[in-house]
Amino acid sequence: MERIPILQMEDFLLVTIQVDMHDRLAMTLQDDLTNRIVKTGVKGVLIEISSLEIVDSFIGRILNNIATMSRILDAETVVVGMQPAVAITLVELGLSLTGVRTALSVEKGMNLLRKSLGLSADAEA
């Protein structure tokens, strides 16, 4: 079964989506990620989606669900690298991604997570 790698960096999980997302892969990512949050006890999740050129309503809902589930499991989520076409599509589909924090780059996303968790923006492991 195809899976998206989930890496741990400091007190964060980093997910870099480098393949075209389909429904089954999105569901697997949701399950894998929530399980890793519980297993590791991390406080932040960064999802990098710059390779995604197309996002449909299901994938948009999954991203929203991941952020909501992460919050329930005491971890903040930031989605980074969203392409303009993806943002336009999400708005046209009526998906506001309520509660999903975004940033333009991985660096800005990590800084946002560190700030929201009260950590130094230049903390190094």
Predicted regions and their residues:
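Non-catalytic signal-transmission and effector/linker regions of two-component phosphorelay proteins
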Residues: 1-8, 118-125
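STAS-typified acidic loop motif
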Residues: 2-30
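Short, contiguous, helix-prone interaction/anchoring segments in small proteins
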Residues: 21, 31-35, 45
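Expand to "…catalyze enediolate/carbanion chemistry for C-C bond making/breaking, isomerization
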Residues: 26-33, 39, 74, 107
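Extended mid-to-C-terminal alpha-helical interaction segments
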Residues: 31-37, 56, 62
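Catalytic cores of nucleotide-enabled group-transfer and carboxylate-activating enzymes in metabolic
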Residues: 37, 66, 111-116, 123
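Amphipathic alpha-helical interaction surfaces in cytosolic regulatory modules
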Residues: 42-43, 47-96
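Short acidic-hydrophobic, aromatic-tinged amphipathic segments that line or gate anion-handling sites
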Residues: 99-109
